[in-house]
Amino acid sequence: MPKILALAGLASLLAAPAYAQLPATTAHTDTYAVATLGGVAPAAAPITVAEVEAAQRAWGNALVAISTEYKTNGQAAAARLAGQVLDTAYGYSLGPVAFKPTLASGETTFRTTREGALAYFVGGDANFPSDTGFALKGWQSYAIDNAAIVLNGSTAISTGNVMLTNDKGEVTTVNKSWGWVRDANGALRIVLHHSSLPYSAH
C-alpha cells in the first residue's frame, strides 16, 4: 500500500502566517506517496512528479554511463564525464550541496563541494584518499522504488530505494533521499542527496 503523507498539521509548525492560510494536500501514485505542501507560490513554475521521476532516471543513467566510460576509456575519461554530470545535475553552482554519500566517513562524510562529490564518484583525489570511485564499480543497470515524493513549489524531495546491478549481476540496494530546486534557467538541480546502506540488526 502506498503511504499517504499527512501534512495537515504542518502549517502550525511554520512561522510565516501566510503558510497557515494554504492547506497541504496529499495524493498518491500506484506505488508511492506524493505530497504538495501549502505555501506561498514561488515565481518559478512548480516542480512536477514527472520532472522528479525524469531527474531520478537521469541520475541513474549517468551513473551507468560513468561506469561504462571507465571500463571503456579509463579513469580520466570517467572523471570528465562525471564532472559534466555534476555541472548539469547538481546545484554546486548555486552554493553548497547537502550530499552525504553511501560510502563515506570521518571528516569527509559530507561532500558539500563539487571537488568532494567528484572524488566520491570517480576517486583519484589526494584530498579524499579513501575514495575509490563509487561510479566505477561496474554498474550496468538500476531500478528506483520511491517511497514518497514531496512537492513544494519550485522545490521537491524524494525518498526510497535505488537498486544498482553491477557487471557480475550483483545487486546493491541503497536507501536514498534527493532534494531539488528549480534554477534560474528552469532546470532541476540536486541540492540534497543522502544515501546509506539498509540497516541490519544482525
Each language-model region and where it sits:
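Gram-negative bacterial Sec-dependent N-terminal signal peptides
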Residues: 1-21
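A solvent-exposed, acidic/Ser-Thr-rich amphipathic alpha-helical stretch
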Residues: 70-146
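Acidic, glycine-rich flexible loop segments
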Residues: 128-176
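Short beta-strand edge/turn micro-motifs at domain boundaries
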Residues: 31-33, 151-159, 169-201
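Short beta-strand segments enriched in hydrophobic/aromatic residues
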Residues: 63, 162-164, 194
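Short, low-complexity N-terminal intrinsically disordered segments enriched in polar/charged residues
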Residues: 21-88, 92
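Intrinsically disordered, low-complexity peptide-like regions
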Residues: 15, 26-28, 191
